[in-house]
Swiss-Prot record:
The active site is at C138 (phosphocysteine intermediate). The gene is dusp29. Substrate binds at H137, C138, V139, M140, G141, R142, S143, R144. It catalyses: O-phospho-L-tyrosyl-[protein] + H2O = L-tyrosyl-[protein] + phosphate; O-phospho-L-seryl-[protein] + H2O = L-seryl-[protein] + phosphate; O-phospho-L-threonyl-[protein] + H2O = L-threonyl-[protein] + phosphate. GO terms for molecular function: MAP kinase phosphatase activity; protein serine/threonine phosphatase activity; protein tyrosine phosphatase activity; protein tyrosine/serine/threonine phosphatase activity. GO terms for cellular component: cytoplasm; nucleus. Residues 47-193 form the Tyrosine-protein phosphatase domain. This is Dual specificity phosphatase 29. Its EC number is 3.1.3.16, 3.1.3.48. The keyword Hydrolase applies. Its main location: cytoplasm. The lineage of its organism: Eukaryota, Metazoa, Chordata, Craniata, Vertebrata. GO terms for biological process: negative regulation of MAPK cascade; protein dephosphorylation. It is an enzyme of class 3 (hydrolase).
Amino acid sequence: MSSCVEKSRGRNPYAAVQVDPDSDYITPGTLDLEQLFWSGPTAQYAHVNQVWPRIYLGDEKTALERPALKDLGITHVLNAAVGKWNNVLTGADYYTGMNIRYLGVEADDKPTFNISQYFSQAAEFIHEALIHPVLVHCVMGRSRSATLVLAYLMIKEHLSVVDAVEHVRQRRCILPNHGFLKQLRALDIALQEEKLRLKRKDE
């Protein structure tokens, strides 16, 4: 998937793209995608929100409160903010004795950071966890972790980037940075191209 994203990233990120000429769906340009976060009602900020069945998107406070995780029934934690600066210092050892599986990724909340390198790994981790509740978090639960949840919904639940954004923002106050939106847009194009390839193969 990452190679497909790299190919799609070479296109003009500000232009809308219609991959399938027989479909009404058009991948929006990055600026139009960004506007989705400012149009219509959105959820108020909270420490944690359930944004999909058994998927909780939250912040540092939620990740550090072991009793709260137990109350939610969390069995898997994806920390999208591993590192020493502007990050959450937990790790697998932090959850010792809680029967929690942990995945940490070192993602910087910078527009230039390549978060797409974690899309497939994070999507697989979330997908395998979904018999039970999973927490995906970063520091604020708005950019890095939100981006990985959006990628999951696109890869595993087959939502378009537009539908994924609309679904999650109605349940949590999120705002991935501009660079992350470019990468989600590239993922959307790659997934649409794969869908078209399979469609033509079956014709």
